[in-house]
Amino acid sequence: MSLLTHHHETEARRSTMLRTAFCPVVRRALEAPDTIEVMANPDGSVWIEKAGIGIVVSEHTLEASDRERVIRLVASGIAEAVGPHAPIVSAELPGSGERFEGLLPPVSTAPCFSIRKPATTPFELGDYVDQGALSPALCAALRDAARTRANILIAGGTSSGKTTFTNALLAEPTFDDDRIVILEDTRELRCAAPNTVQLRTHRGSVCLQQLVRSTLRLRPDRIIVGEVRGAEALDLLKAWNTGHPGGITTLHANSAYGALRRLEQLTLEATRRAPFDLIAEAIDVVVFMSRAGGQRRVEEALRVSGFDGESYVTEPLVSRSLSLVTQGDMT
């Protein structure tokens, strides 16, 4: 038996054991095609986010012992200790790759966890237009930005659709002829380009900043980072600005312009002064995603053209009249 076959069989067994440990309400929710995320709270309530609907509460609850068993089983599967001195478990579930976050006391009052399903049906930019989440003019402008190797920053709140939109951009044919290197904490991005390398951080040994630096030795044409959260932001900006344009990354922010200020804050984890000019030169386009209930849409897109000493010089990627959409039904 080859090592690869043995690994796949082990993953299959782990997946079966884990899903057996889930109570029926969690199993049914994960099996439902319209489920986006399942959340088990410390009080035992179970909340489910459904596509096009939003978050609803289940009529079923989970006992603390059941919630803790799930968390411990996930921790065991990734060979991590869990308990009062290590109460947080972050993992990718075996099999279908759901993103798992579990917490135990003392950081939570009782065991709780969240399971986010990966997108099973990839969306393309045209799908956003069809569902009223993106105007045709803005869609064309974003396609042109990707084609001309603009560096694109996608911002938004939690669960606003940043990853799904990144995947839609990566599905564009313009990426097919390039060598793409994708860096992530959890494997969520998909790129059909034939010359694609996907790398993932490893807790305690390999951080995102190290991966960005290592990537430069892999001869990338485009560098894609799932989400910047810290000092790696500075390394990525330098990479994009020194011969590796055409990248995409995401971060949490409350507006398109606010994403540039948030980027400043992240770079300050690696330097004493925010690199305003570097940010203005490296970031070409900022896309802001929003969510209201179960609806996600592209709320705003800016073109960045410089820094005037006090603020970033920006303008709408397309005129406001052309960027408006009548409805946002993107999930």
Each model region followed by its residue ranges:
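Active-site phosphate-binding and catalytic loops of NTP-dependent enzymes
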Residues: 22-28, 74-93, 178, 270-276
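Hydrophobic anchor at the beta1->P-loop junction of P-loop NTPases
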Residues: 154-156
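N-terminal anchoring/assembly modules that precede and organize ATP-driven motor systems
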Residues: 1-57
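Conserved P-loop NTPase
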Residues: 280-331
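Switch/coupling sub-region of P-loop NTPases
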Residues: 149-152, 168-282, 288-291
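Conserved lysine of the Walker
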Residues: 162
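Walker A (P-loop) phosphate-binding loop of P-loop NTPases
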Residues: 159
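P-loop NTP-binding catalytic core
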Residues: 49, 55-148
